[in-house]
Amino acid sequence: MILESIVIVGFALLLDFLVGDPKTKYHPTAWIGKLIALLVPFAKNNSVKRELIGGILIVGTVITVVGILLVGLEFGISLLTIDIVSFIVSVALGSILLKTTIAIRGMQKHALAVVDAVEKEDLDLARNHLSMIVKRDTKNLDKNHILSGVLESVSENTVDGITGPLFYYAIFGLPGAFVYRAVTVSYTHLTLPTILLV
């Protein structure tokens, strides 16, 4: 079990370095975002308390759905009776799924695009690239604030897209990594000023 988990982490990291995050509607994080977007209209309310309760129910629903799906998948794999087949299937699926919770290459790509634009003294391009990885308005940021924004984003996303998923995977397996991602995606979707809970 421990060897299997180590192999899964190794292959997931290798996949991230080789492939990165393909932009696709079939990415599990995109599915989580769509589920949240589907549930948000039911939570909107003029009462702040009711909207807060609605947001909590959305997060609870998303965590429950993600948890059930991943526990079910792990149970299905455990039913395979041939040990080597079970190991191969578990490592293959586990690596691919765990990779979808990790975003090292994608963050590196976006952060370097900002830094490269700053080094070329193209602050408009740097602001544009930065706007893809931060929530704040970047239109009037100077060079120091642009670099500060990149550093802040890389720091936050190191936790959200690397150490967090791996930590929860180490303790709870794939369900833990995915529930963690579901919580971080929920936070992002539910705290945008135009959506809910702000």
Model-derived regions: residue spans:
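Juxtamembrane "helix exit" motif at the C-terminal ends of alpha-helical transmembrane segments
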Residues: I2-E4, V65-I82, F167-V183
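Conserved small/polar residues in nucleotide/adenosyl-binding loops
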Residues: D16, T188-T194
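N-terminal transmembrane-helix/juxtamembrane module of multi-pass inner/ER membrane proteins
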Residues: L18-L57
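Hydrophobic alpha-helical transmembrane segments
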Residues: T81-L93
